[in-house]
Structures are given as structure tokens and as C-alpha cells.
Curated annotation (Swiss-Prot):
Name of the protein this chain belongs to: Vacuolar cation-transporting ATPase YPK9
UniProt-annotated stretches for the region Disordered: 1-32, 71-115, 179-273
Compositional bias annotation for Acidic residues: 234-243
Spans within the Cytoplasmic topological domain: 1-293, 345-488, 534-693, 749-1244, 1290-1307, 1375-1387, 1447-1472
Native species: Saccharomyces cerevisiae (strain ATCC 204508 / S288c)
Length: 1472
């Protein structure tokens, strides 16, 4: 195994730095000109090789994006695909037409746990198909950098170029600004008094199209004709003229008659309408697109929001074969219909004709999980440029000026053709639109209007015409789930294979004259159907009510404010956020003016309110860039309002009349819409238990077929008539494969979910519960999860002057009165006073708190820091005027009035007795005049501050110490900076650094215009704030329980690595004596490793660069593996470096890190997400528990995500716990194991019940007899159903065992004992049957007697089988280690007692009594009764001990899980 050396890693590292493209966010993607098809190739490649177990999805924004963005670490080193087909004729870029090829390098990395299961499409078709994606123009080079440009300049130098070197320059947004007429409508061209103009003849089609000017004076909606080409209009006029001339020849009486009958007035218009509709048919496609000949018959599409690959094929209906199909359905009494309903691909093969995508009448869509649907194609007149409906890609080079390219947005041209007909279909509430330019279906979820970069333009709102265009293109702004009608649900239920089999069985039983049994089963089936109907309607209604939202909004339309329904909003609309009617945001929008506070807990599970600020011009440029990559950056998210979030406060800025926002996404294209889709269409889990259950049913079906054949042979020997023989043989099938068998899978799960709900744990994905029983590794966030939510301030350490030696840290101050013991902030007499005053001011002002109804809202750390000061915080402060004496334009005036802004103010709290500051001193009133919010990429925030009547402006910055030290003047850093920092972090404390400076210009205007880059540069270091984060009391105990259960525990946090290690040790998560941390060698010599692993306590001790094993001191030899007791702690930058270029690094090296790391620190949200994926690659079943928005990506990616949130059901994770500690993890695992074992036991019980009845019936069939009608009823309804339900009521066992329950239903260790049990059942029925025939009181059965089944054979087998049903349930009701002992299941004990008592009672029943006659029993002797009792007791012990003992003899199947094989190899090395 080779260590990643400098010429492996360093090459990527140095080339990366030379390009200035550090990868700060793994979910981010580079927006370059790389082919969209190459992008999709990578996407498919990832999907086939990386197990994304979640749903498709930090500071709040990035986490929300993580819901629906694919996370990849692949660099752009995939082999170039070759071109496929002559595509240049379609006006497409060659790079966009390259086929989607699979990368062998990526395939060799690791096999996916969720391989594609395309059945309709072949793998070759999917691999070679042309493709599109919701990620337009993305090349998946994961060196994308979310860090703002100026921060890149600071880190990497100003002489280097960057792919994203500036928010404006070298970005797609820049090209948007130069060609912003694309995809939008110029205000000059769309309004005003100019008459409508025709654009002239389109060179592409030969048709002339309407310009359709959208005058604000026009109040009428477009008619259909206004969207129809001019040439077709002329044909319309000819039709109308012909109609007119025809009518003129009619007699006046005829005309009067026609008028009276309301026919003459519209007959001509009907012809026109029919003629227009005729042109919408696929046959006329070339008439409108002569230069865009369709060639592709199928395509592939990657839905990034759901991390889903789908195949799309185009078809038309063959009329001849459609008639044949309907005829076959009629002649087979609907059997063909049922088959094609259950197997829809047969319908496609029967009457579907393959056609090009553009000519489809309907499309076949299959996703990678084999889910198959058929969707109709919708065609409607549109007659607008392509860029108005689909994201436009061919933007001109930024170096060109708009005047040079001479393009107009509503002029069709070669790269932006007119779209006369909009060809669409809908899949999972996503609208797919055909692009003639690419000959592919695409989506417009992330469509942008280039005019958005100009805030002065967008603030004018839309015209009525543009709104109607966009409503046609994007649909209504509503998330309305189409609820099936009662008849539809009923129809689907009745035609489900389960109920069809039930109907078949009932008909069979009716023909066989089992009327009572058939009637009862029919009644139960009807009740079950209606119960399922009500449940489905309830669930769909709840989901629809949760997703649907409607309100009235005030919108700027045609430059006038009007009130409309929120469903009429379209991208680009300007609406009023401060409208009291709006309490929940109706769409995804960008805040344009004022500020507001929102609660995003419904989306993220994060209960901390989030502040939103008005967008700037830079924000809009970045928004355009972000939409191209579907990644909403933290920078943009500070102004981004997500659909479905609650507005806590919308504060109107002084001088403005309302808080305004612009709509950017609507309906299902919004973040909420994507999340609702993920709930309605959950990704199949692929859990082995469910796959095996159907294999198991198949196995039982083989037994049924065998029984069918044996019975037929036996009936022929007995000479039964054909009708009886056929009925009896078919009855065998209904017995061996009971229709209720699949339903038993959900019994245990439903009871477990109810128990979890009682504990405050809610689940939105029930299938994940059984998976939780198989968890191998559990990952935890630190702050708020393992530790308390609130941080307590331990104290502060101020940087003090140290004479000629520079600066040093003072003593730890735990009392705020020791920080600056003065009465006024202006009272400074020494350098130390100035330093202390400035540090104190940073504590007072550098935070993101907001005041709502007198309560402070914001980040808990900020809250604790400000609470430590004992001062007061007020917004909209007007008690005291803040003067700006050096304002150039407004000398000596009060600046809030000049600037129309009143600052937030901090001042001494007069109610605080410990306050030493003077209340009325103007210097003690600090106004926060500007804030630079915290960005997760920068890991810091800043504010600009001014005192009440001083002319000085300060800037203060706080953030991670290692980040703050980089932007400070080095001379101001204390000499013991690293030593003090290491001391605190090593002991588990959280450290925040503060810095500040005086701004060079003392004007209000300068404070509002100065860039963040300038504010956060050349700062004076001020000091540290030290927080202590106490462990939650349940943390250590829970972690110990997990470790005792052999479940690996991992901490995954954004905190400092030393703090994480300290907390890990305190919590017991780290139990090894040594912890090795990595460091990156920035200047390695040739061949030297870039990453060096050192002992955190003894840096001289390192790990071997090849094996990652401890190295002995002196001779550099590897220590004995038996003596190794260590773990690894990985930092985010190292994790990024390793897994970004994972194909270049030995797999063994990466596996060693993943297997031995207990701590992952300084991890970004996307890195947490990727860690889940990397662990899943080793075949771990991964759980993740977190409490905030930072963890949303990891919660969705993990096999089992548990969110600690106040929301009852957050879409952020499958499980949401109101228990705010990690003990809920134990509950989920316990109930998961109990549910899995219960489902397993119920499934086995139903199988053995079928086997017992099958053996009984087979023996009776051999004598030409059967069980009686009421005997079947007694067994099935009074014995089996109550037992199966009561079995499922067993609660979970308190202790979690080391061994995980098996989920393999078809392994030899399950099937062999099952077959032994079946043999024992047969043996213990066969012997009494043989013996009874020798009794003197023996009554022979009547051969073929349907009504009279009284016989000793029947009675004895009925009694014996009754006990077998009961005792089998007892044998299968296993208690510990996964469920409570059977004795604690009170309901089960009662049911078993009653059942045994009833069975004993039947044995003593008088056969001449009413009940005896009903059950058709015959008398047996008392001695034989005792024999049966003793015999069934022997049967019980035989079943209890024999199958398990045989199971123990079977060799345990070797685990195929990759991580287990690696651990076994390592154990072998240790033994050697």
C-alpha cells in the first residue's frame, strides 16, 4: 500500500492553490462551460457507485440546499466522452451532445449499495443516452469555492486567477448582465403606448410570430389566437370567410332557426378551434421546427433535488394494436387489463410505437429503482422565445458589450429559437419542457431572469402580460397534492393483487359451498378496504393540508399595487412582505428592502430564528450564479426567504413604506416543494428484509404448487369428479400462500411507531424503523447534541501591552466588571484602558441578536455573550439622537434622518444593580450602524459601531481564533496566542476571538459603502471569550450503552479539533489512550507525505505514513499491533483534501482512516454529508443524530437520521425527537430491533400457520375429506388473528445486545429450521391420524362430501392443529435480547390462555350440542383426549429445542460487509 505522497496529493493541492479554487463546500459545483452531458455522465456514475441513502438534502442556508443537491468529491478527471450522433444540426454545442459514459475509475472505487434497477431500459441505453439535469452547465469539479472573492484574494494572493474570482467578474452573472435581455422582457419593449409589432419572418420556421406587446394599459388576458403564428391566423381568416359566405346563401328562416338553436353563431369558430388543435398534434412538428429535426427516441435525466436518475422514452399509440388490446381485455373478462395494470411495461409493448421525443403522445418514465409510470404529453400554444421558459445557457462572453451582440430578448434567433408550441409532461410534480435546441426534455426549476441583477429594474415589478407568460411557463404558485377521489382509491385497492387474490379465494370458497367462511372473509376484506381507504384519505389530507398554503398578497403589477391570491405569483413579481396578511412566506423569494426575522424550523429543524437582510447588487449577481449550480450560498441566503417559513417580524426601514421581496421560485420548484416531493415519493430503502420477504413468499408458492400437484394425483386415485378435484386443488393455493402474509410485515412496525410517539419521537418514514435495528455506526453532532444547547461564559482574556515585547494575554476575567471598571466608555487614560474598552465594546456590539417584543432572539452563543455584559439592546432606538458631524453632505445634521436609518443601540441596563456605568452618559450609547453577518465559509462576522455623540466609527470582528489571527496585524497578536488557545481547546472549552479597528473615514456615507474586505483587514487583536460547553447528563451513559452494544460512535462537529477531542474523552466516546491528529505539510519535499499524523499529547509520536500505525521512537519501526491502542481525529481541511481526490489516493489508506477515526472536527455541513456516504461505502448502516440546520444534509444522507427539534415532524430527518438528548437514539434502535424481530416472527408464524393448515388439508384430501366451514372460521378468525396481533404487542428489551437481529429471511439458518418445523408439524399430525384409524370408535370420512365432513380424521386433526397454531406462536414469541420476555406481554398471555382453554373445551364438547354440530365434530374417547394433550406438549418441546439445535450446527454465513472484512484482516495481522 502506498502512502499519498507529495507527488500524489501535493500535485492536486498545489495546482488547486495555483488556480485559487479551494473547495469550501462539497455540495457546491463549479459553474463553467463544461458540457451538460458530461455533467450528467458524472452524475450517473456517482449514482451507480456512491450510496446516497437519503433523500435527496451550517448556517441555515447551506443546510437547506443540502436537501436537494448531490454531494460529490470527484475532480474533473473523468475521461472525455465521445460525441454521439450528428447533433450540430440542432444548434447545440458539441460538448452538450456528448454521450453519458460511466467512469471505470469511479466504478472501481466501490460498488454501490443501491445499484440501478432499470428494467424497461437496458443499462446500455441508460449509459449511452443523451442526458439533461436540473444542474445546468455543471462540471462537478469539486474545487468550487464558496468563499467570497476578496477572501480568496487574501488567502491565495492577488496575482492569481480564480474560476470564481469575483462575485461580478469572470462569472456567469457577469455575462447575464451583458446579455440580460435574454429570458426576460425589456420594460421598453413590453410597456408603453407603442403599437404591437411583428418581429418579421423567422428564418428557422418560415412563420411570422406575434410580438405580443404587453402594455400596462391592456387589462385583458391573452387569447389563444394571440399565441398562434400569423400564417395559421390567415388560414383561420379564410375558414371564417368561407363560413360567412356559406351562411349568406342560407335563407333568412334558416339563419333564424340556427340563431335560435345557438348553432350558427359558433360553427365557424368550432372549425377554427379544431384546425388550431389539429396543428398541435405531433404530426405537424416539422411544420414549426423545420431546422430542428427530432432524432432522439429516449433520454436520461438527473433530478438533482432527489438524487434520482430517470429514463424517458417517447411513444405514440398504435390504433390497430390498441383496438386489439381492448378486445383482449373484453374476451378475457379483464384478465389482460389486470396483467397490464400490474405490469405496465406490457401495455407499452402491446400498443406503443417508438417515436422521437418531440413527437410523443405519451412518455414512459422509469427511475433507477425500477419504478415505472406512463405520463401523457401536453401541447399548448406558447409562441415565445425559448429563454422565457427554460434556463438559457448560451450567454455571450463577458468581454462583449450588449451593443456588440445586438440581441433582443423577444427576438427569436439561432441560439434562442421561438417556441410556437410548448411540449410538456409532468413527473412527480416536476414540469418537463421540450427544448428543440437540444432535442431533450428539461426543467425550469432554477430559471433566472438576467434583469434581476439590476435592482432598480426589478423594483418596477412585472406587467400583466409578462405575468401571464410566466404563469403559463412555470404554472401556478401552489403546492397542491392531487388527492385521489374515493372511487379512485377504492378502484386501486380492489384491483391490488392482494385483494384480487382475496376475490379469487372468496369465489372459490363460494363455489365450494363454504358460504359462511367466504361471507366472513368477504366482510373482513370490505372492512379492510374501507379502513385502508379512510387511512389513505386521512394521510393524503394531512399531507395536503401541511403542504398547501394560500393567502392574499399585495403585488406590484403594471406599476400599481394590487391584491391577488398568492397562487398567482410568478418569478419576478414584487410583493409586500410586511403585509399583516402574510404570516407564512408563500414562495421562495429574495428580500429587497427592510429586514425581517423568520423561523425555518419546518424545513431545517433549527428552532433558532434567522435574520434576513435586504439584497444588494452583489447578492443578485451571486444569486444568478447560485441558480446555475442549484447551490444557494450563505452569502445569498442572508437575503433569501424560503417558502413555508414563518415570519416572526418584518420591520419596515425608516423612509420606506413596506418591506418588499421578489419572487424567484414558485410552487413545487421551491425548497418546500422539493421537500414535499421527497415525502410523497420517498426513496426506496432497499432493505434486505423486504426483498427477502417476497423471495420467501415465492418459496411458499413453490410448496403450494407441489401441494397442488400431489392433491390432483390423490384426487384422481380417489376417483373424485373433476369439479371437486379442481376446487380442492385450487384451495391448496389459498392455504399455503395466505393473502394476509404480506400485511404481517407492518404489524410490528406500527406498534413500535406508536410507542415511539408516546415517547415524543416522531417518524415520517416508517420503513426506516426496521433499518434502525441494523445500525452499525452512530454519528453525533457535538454542540446541542452531546453537550448542552447553551454555552456558559467561563471568562475573557484580554490582549495587554507587554512593553517592547509586544502583546501578551492578561489573566482570565470571569466577572464583567473586571473587564473595564469605569463609569464611562470615554474614560480611558492608558493603552490598557483603550484595549479593554475596545474589547468590551466588541462584546456589546458584535453579535446578530434581534429584539422581538422585548425578547432577544438569535444565536445562543451571541445571547450568552451579550447576557454576560449585563447591558440592554434595543432596535429602532429613538430616545437619543446620533450625530454625524463629519457627513460631507449633511454637516451638523442628525444622521438617522439623513440616512433614513435608526441604528440598533446598546446601553447600560438601568435595572441591573451590578451596572457601574452612568445611564445618561452619551458615550455609553453605542449604535450598530452596519452588520456583516456570520458566514459559514468565513467563520466570522463584523459590525460597524458609533457612539452617541462621538465622531469615530469602529469596526469589530469576532470568529474562530485561527481565522481572526489571519486578518489581524501580526504585531498585535500576543506572543502566547497559540499556547493559550491550545490550553483552552485541549481542555474542551470553546474559544472565540475578537478584533477591531477605527475606520479611516469618519462619515456615515463611508460606513455604508465600505466593503467587508476592507473592514476585515489589518485588525487589532483584542482578546478571547472562553465558553464552557457542559455535557448533557444523558450523553456518557448513552454512548456507553451504544459501545457495549458494539455500535461504533463518532463525533462529527464544526468545532475545534482539540475541543472535540476533549469533549470526546469526557463523554467516553474516545476510550483509546492515544489520539492522533493530522497536519498538512504545505511545503513537502519530493516524495514526502503531505499529511502527517501526530499524537495530540506527544507531538513527537507519529503514525507510519503507509500503514497509519504508531511508529516506535528512535528506529522508526512500527510498533507491535497488539500494543496499539489509538484512534484518529480528522479535521475538515484534511478530510476535504483526502476525499476530493479519492481516486488518486490508495483505497486502503482511506479505509484505514474511516475505520479508525472517532472525531471529525471543523466539518462543514457538506463534509458531514460526504462522511455519511463514505461510511456507507464500507457497508456500514449509518445513523446520525443532530439538532440544527447544520446537520440537515447528514440527516438526510444517513440510513437513519434523528433530529432533535421542537417541530413535531420536521422534513429534515426521518425521525424527529422532542427528547433533547441522545437517549432517544437508544429508543429508536431498541424499537427498530423489536419491530424487525416482531415482523420476522409474525412472518414466520403466518408461514407456519399456512404449513400447519396445508398439512392438515393434504392429509384429509388423501381420504377425500376436508375441514368444515366453521372449523376454518374458528382457526382463521378466533385463533390466528388475535394471536398474530398480540404477538406484535411485545415491547422492546431495555438493554441493547451486541448482536444485531437478522434480517435475512432466506438464509439456510432460517429456511432449514423452518423446514424442520414443518416436518415436525407433519409428524405430530400424521401419527395421531394413523393411530385414530385403529380405534374402535373410528368414523371414516365420506369421500368427496362437501357438506358432511364429520369423521374421526377431521376431528383429531382439527384438535391437534388447534394446539399447533397456539404452541407455534409461543415458540416464536422470543423475548430477550430484542424484546421483553413473553411474560410481560399481558395481552398475549391472556390470548394464549383463552385459546388453550377454548381448545381444551372443544375436546370435551358434546358432539350433539349446537356448537358440536356447527363444528361438525365426532366423539373421541377420554383416553385419546389425554393422548392428544400429552402429544401436543411433546410437539411443543420438540419445536422449542430441535430446530434451534439444528440451526446451531449450520455454519454461519460469512459477512459480506466490507468494513467487517477489513476489520477481520486487521485482526489477523494482530494475531500474526
Amino acid at each position: 500500500m502506498d502512502i499519498p505522497s507529495s507527488n500524489q496529493i501535493q500535485h492536486g493541492q498545489r495546482s488547486e492553490r495555483n488556480r485559487r479554487m479551494p473547495r469550501a463546500s462539497f455540495s457546491s459545483t463549479a459553474t463553467t462551460s463544461t458540457a451538460a452531458t458530461l455533467t450528467s455522465a458524472m452524475v450517473l456514475d456517482q449514482n451507480n457507485s456512491e450510496p446516497y441513502a437519503g433523500a435527496t438534502f451550517e448556517a441555515v442556508p447551506s443546510s437547506i440546499v443540502s436537501f436537494h443537491h448531490p454531494h460529490s468529491f470527484q475532480s474533473s478527471n473523468l475521461p472525455s466522452p465521445h460525441s454521439s450522433g450528428n447533433l450540430e444540426q440542432r444548434g447545440r454545442r458539441l460538448t452538450e451532445s456528448e454521450p453519458l459514459v460511466l467512469s471505470s475509475a469511479e466504478q472501481s472505487r466501490s460498488s454501490s449499495r443501491n445499484p440501478s434497477h432499470f428494467r424497461f431500459f437496458t443499462q446500455e441505453q441508460i449509459s449511452n443516452a443523451e442526458g439533461a439535469s436540473t444542474l445546468e452547465n455543471t462540471d462537478y469539479d469539486m474545487a468550487w469555492d464558496a468563499t467570497p472573492a476578496y477572501e480568496q484574494d487574501r488567502i491565495y494572493g492577488t496575482g492569481l486567477s480564480s474560476r470564481r474570482s469575483s462575485i461580478r467578474s469572470f462569472s456567469r452573472a457577469s455575462s447575464l448582465s451583458n446579455a440580460k435581455s435574454y429570458g426576460s422582457f425589456s420594460k421598453r419593449g413590453r410597456s408603453g403606448s407603442r403599437a404591437p409589432q411583428r418581429l418579421g419572418e423567422n428564418s428557422d420556421t418560415g412563420f411570422v410570430y406575434h410580438s405580443a406587446t404587453h402594455s400596462s394599459s391592456s387589462l385583458s388576458r391573452y387569447t389563444t389566437r394571440e399565441r398562434i403564428p400569423i400564417e395559421l391566423e390567415s388560414q383561420t381568416d379564410e375558414i371564417l370567410e368561407d363560413e360567412s359566405s356559406t351562411h349568406s346563401l342560407e335563407s333568412s328562416d334558416s339563419r333564424r332557426s340556427a340563431s335560435e338553436n345557438n348553432r350558427g353563431s359558433f360553427s365557424g369558430h368550432d372549425d377554427v378551434h379544431n384546425q388550431h388543435s389539429e396543428y398541435l398534434k405531433p404530426d405537424y412538428h416539422e411544420k414549426f421546427y423545420p431546422q430542428y429535426a427530432p432524432n432522439l427516441h429516449y433520454q436520461r435525466f438527473y433530478i438533482a433535488e432527489e438524487d434520482l436518475v430517470i429514463g424517458i422514452a417517447a411513444y405514440q399509440t398504435s390504433k390497430f394494436w390498441y383496438i386489439i388490446y381492448n378486445l383482449c381485455c373484453f374476451l378475457t373478462f379483464g384478465l389482460v387489463y389486470l396483467l397490464t395494470r400490474w405490469l405496465p411495461h406490457l401495455k407499452v409493448k402491446l400498443y406503443g410505437v417508438k417515436v422521437p421525443l418531440a413527437k410523443a403522445e405519451w412518455v414512459v418514465i422509469e427511475n433507477e429503482f425500477g419504478e415505472f409510470v406512463i405520463q401523457p404529453i401536453d401541447r399548448q400554444w406558447y409562441n415565445r422565445p425559448l429563454s422565457t421558459v427554460l434556463p438559457f445557457e448560451n450567454y455571450p462572453n463577458p468581454s462583449y458589450e450588449p451593443n456588440d451582440i445586438n440581441l433582443s430578448h423577444h427576438h427569436a434567433n439561432e441560439i434562442n429559437p421561438n417556441v410556437p408550441i410548448l411540449i410538456t409532461f409532468e413527473y412527480r410534480y416536476i414540469k418537463f419542457i421540450y427544448s428543440p435546441l437540444d432535442d431533450l426534455f428539461k426543467t425550469n426549476n432554477n430559471w433566472i431572469d438576467p434583469d434581476w441583477v439590476d435592482l432598480s429594474t426589478v423594483s418596477n415589478g412585472l406587467t400583466k402580460g409578462v405575468q401571464e407568460d410566466r404563469e403559463l411557463a412555470f404554472g401556478k404558485n401552489q403546492i397542491n397534492l392531487r388527492m385521489k377521489t374515493t372511487s379512485e382509491i377504492l378502484f386501486n385497492e380492489v384491483l391490488h393483487p392482494f385483494y384480487v387474490f382475496q376475490v379469487f379465494s372468496i369465489i372459490l370458497w363460494g363455489i365450494d359451498e363454504y358460504y359462511y367462511y367466504a361471507a366472513c372473509i368477504f366482510l373482513i376484506s370490505v372492512l379492510s378496504i374501507f379502513d385502508s381507504l379512510n387511512e389513505q384519505k386521512k394521510v393524503s389530507r394531512n399531507l395536503a393540508e401541511m403542504s398547501h398554503f394560500h393567502c392574499d398578497v399585495r403585488v406590484l403589477r403594471d406599476k400599481f399595487w394590487t391584491t391577488i391570491s398568492s397562487s398567482e405569483l410568478v418569478p419576478g413579481d414584487i410583493y409586500e412582505v410586511s403585509d399583516p396578511n402574510i404570516t407564512i412566506l408563500p414562495c421562495d423569494s429574495i428580500l429587497l428592502s427592510s429586514d425581517c426575522i423568520v423561523n425555518e424550523s419546518m424545513l431545517t429543524g433549527e428552532s433558532v430564528p434567522v435574520s434576513k437582510f435586504p439584497a444588494t447588487e452583489e447578492t443578485m449577481y451571486q444569486l444568478c450564479d447560485d441558480f446555475q449550480s442549484t447551490q444557494i450560498s450563505s452569502f445569498v441566503s442572508k437575503s433569501f426567504l424560503y417558502n413555508g417559513t414563518n415570519i416572526i417580524r418584518a420591520r419596515i426601514a425608516p423612509g420606506q413604506t413596506a418591506a418588499l421581496a421578489m419572487v424567484v421560485r414558485t410552487g413545487f420548484s421551491t425548497t418546500k416543494g422539493s421537500l414535499v416531493r421527497s415525502m410523497v415519493f420517498p426513496k426506496p430503502t432497499g432493505f434486505k428484509f423486504y426483498r427477502d420477504s417476497f423471495k420467501y413468499i415465492g418459496f411458499m408458492s413453490l410448496i403450494a404448487i407441489f401441494g397442488f400437484c400431489v392433491s390432483c394425483v390423490q384426487f384422481i386415485k380417489l376417483g373424485l369428479d373433476k369439479k371437486t378435484m379442481i376446487l380442492r386443488a385450487l384451495d391448496i393455493i389459498t392455504i399455503v400462500v395466505p393473502p394476509a402474509l404480506p400485511a404481517t410485515l407492518t404489524i410490528g412496525t406500527n406498534f413500535a411507531l406508536s410507542r415511539l410517539k408516546e415517547k415524543g419521537i416522531f417518524c415520517i418514514s416508517p420503513t426506516r424503523l426496521n433499518i434502525s435495528g441494523k445500525i452499525d455506526v452512530m454519528c453525533f453532532d457535538k454542540t446541542g447534541t452531546l453537550t448542552e444547547d447553551g454555552l456558559d461564559v467561563l471568562g475573557v482574556q484580554i490582549s495587554e501591552p507587554n512593553g517592547v515585547r509586544g502583546q501578551k494575554f492578561g489573566e482570565l476575567l470571569s466577572d464583567i466588571r473586571q473587564v473595564f471598571p469605569k463609569f464611562s466608555l470615554n474614560d480611558c487614560s492608558s493603552p490598557l484602558d483603550f484595549k479593554s474598552r475596545n474589547f468590551f465594546m466588541s462584546l456589546l456590539t458584535c453579535h446578530s441578536l434581534r429584539s422581538v417584543d422585548g425578547n432577544l432572539l438569535g444565536d445562543p452563543l451571541d445571547f450568552k455573550m451579550f447576557q454576560f455584559t449585563g447591558w440592554s439592546f434595543e432596535e429602532d432606538f429613538q430616545k437619543r439622537a446620533f450625530h454625524s458631524l463629519y457627513e460631507g453632505r449633511h454637516e451638523d445634521d442628525v444622521f438617522p434622518e439623513n440616512s433614513e436609518i435608526i441604528p440598533a443601540v446598546v446601553h447600560p441596563d438601568s435595572n441591573n444593580r451590578e451596572n457601574t456605568f452612568t445611564d445618561n452618559d452619551p458615550h455609553n450609547f453605542l449604535g450598530v450602524v452596519r452588520s456583516f453577518e456570520f458566514l459559514s465559509e468565513l467563520r466570522r462576522m463584523s459590525v460597524i459601531v458609533k457612539t452617541n455623540n462621538d465622531d469615530v466609527y469602529w469596526s469589530f470582528t469576532k470568529g474562530a481564533p485561527e481565522v481572526i489571527s489571519e486578518i489581524c496585524n501580526k504585531s498585535t497578536l500576543p506572543a502566547d496566542f497559540e499556547e493559550v488557545l491550545r490550553c483552552y481547546t485541549h481542555n474542551g472549552y470553546r474559544v472565540i476571538a475578537c478584533a477591531g479597528k477605527t475606520l479611516p473615514k469618519r462619515t456615515w456615507l463611508y460606513s455604508q459603502k465600505v466593503s467587508r474586505e476592507e473592514v476585515e483587514s489589518n485588525l487589532e487583536f483584542l482578546g478571547f471569550i472562553i465558553f464552557q460547553n457542559k455535557l448533557k447528563k444523558e450523553t456518557s451513559e448513552t454512548l456507553k450503552s451504544l459501545q457495549d452494544a458494539n455500535i461504533r460512535t463518532i463525533m462529527c462537529t464544526g468545532d475545534n479539533i482539540l475541543t472535540a477531542i476533549s469533549v470526546g474523552r469526557e463523554a467516553g466516546l474516545i476510550q483509546c489512550s492515544r489520539v492522533y491528529v493530522p497536519s498538512i505539510n504545505d511545503t513537502p519535499l519530493h516524495g514526502e507525505p503531505v499529511i502527517v499524523w501526530r499524537d495530540v499529547n506527544e507531538p513527537d509520536k507519529i503514525l507510519d505514513t503507509k500503514t497509519l500505525k504508531p511508529v516506535k521512537l528512535g528506529n522508526n519501526s512500527v510498533e507491535s499491533l497488539r500494543e496499539c491502542n489509538y484512534t484518529l481525529a480528522v479535521s475538515g481541511d484534511v478530510f476535504r483534501l483526502l476525499f476530493r481526490d479519492e481516486n488518486e489516493i490508495p483505497e486502503e489508506y482511506l479505509n484505514e482512516i474511516l475505520l479508525n477515526s472517532s472525531i471529525y472536527a471543523r466539518m462543514s455541513p457538506d463534509e458531514k454529508h460526504e462522511l455519511m456516504i463514505q461510511l456507507q461505502k464500507l457497508d456500514y448502516t449509518v445513523g446520525f443524530c443532530g439538532d440544527g440546520a447544520n446537520d440537515c444534509g447528514a440527516l438526510k444522507a444517513a440510513d437513519v437520521g434523528i433530529s432533535l427539534s421542537e417541530a413535531e415532524a420536521s422534513v429534515a430527518a426521518p425521525f424527529t425527537s422532542k427528547i433533547f438528548n441522545i437517549s432517544c437514539v437508544l429508543d429508536v434502535i431498541r424499537e427498530g430491533r423489536a419491530a424487525l424481530v416482531t415482523s420476522f416472527a409474525c412472518f414466520q408464524y403466518m408461514s407456519l400457520y399456512s404449513a400447519i393448515q396445508f398439512i392438515t388439508i393434504t392429509i384429509l384430501y388423501s381420504r377425500g375429506s376436508n375441514l368444515g366451514d366453521f372449523q376454518f372460521l374458528y382457526i382463521d378468525l378466533l385463533l390466528i388473528v388475535p394471536i398474530a396481533i398480540c404477538m406484535s404487542w411485545s415491547k422492546s428489551y431495555e438493554k441493547i445486545d451486541k448482536k444485531r437481529p437478522s434480517a435475512n429471511l432466506v438464509s439456510p439458518k432460517i429456511l432449514v429450521p423452518l423446514l424442520i418445523s414443518v416436518f415436525l408439524v407433519f409428524l405430530f399430525q400424521f401419527i395421531p391420524w394413523i393411530i385414530v384409524q385403529k380405534m374402535s370408535w373410528y368414523i371414516k370420512p365420506i369421500v368427496g362430501g362437501d357438506d358432511a365432513v364429520q369423521s374421526s380424521d377431521n376431528t383429531v386433526l382439527f384438535f391437534v392443529s388447534n394446539f399447533q397454531y397456539i404452541l407455534t406462536a409461543i415458540v416464536l414469541s422470543v423475548g430477550p435480547p430484542y424484546r421483553e420476555p413473553m411474560s410481560k406481554n399481558f395481552e398475549f398471555i391472556v390470548d394464549i390462555t383463552v385459546s388453550i382453554g377454548a381448545s381444551l373445551l372443544l375436546m370435551t364438547l358434546d358432539t350433539e350440542s349446537y356448537l358440536g354440530k356447527m363444528l361438525q365434530l365426532t366423539p373421541i374417547s377420554n383416553s385419546f383426549t389425554m393422548f392428544i394433550i400429552v402429544w401436543v406438549i411433546l410437539n411443543y418441546y420438540a419445536q422449542l429445542y430441535i430446530p434451534p439445535s439444528i440451526k446451531g450446527w449450520l455454519k454461519k454465513k460469512k459477512s459480506s460487509k466490507k468494513y467487517k472484512l477489513l476489520i477481520q484482516e486487521e485482526m489477523k495481522l494482530k494475531e500474526v
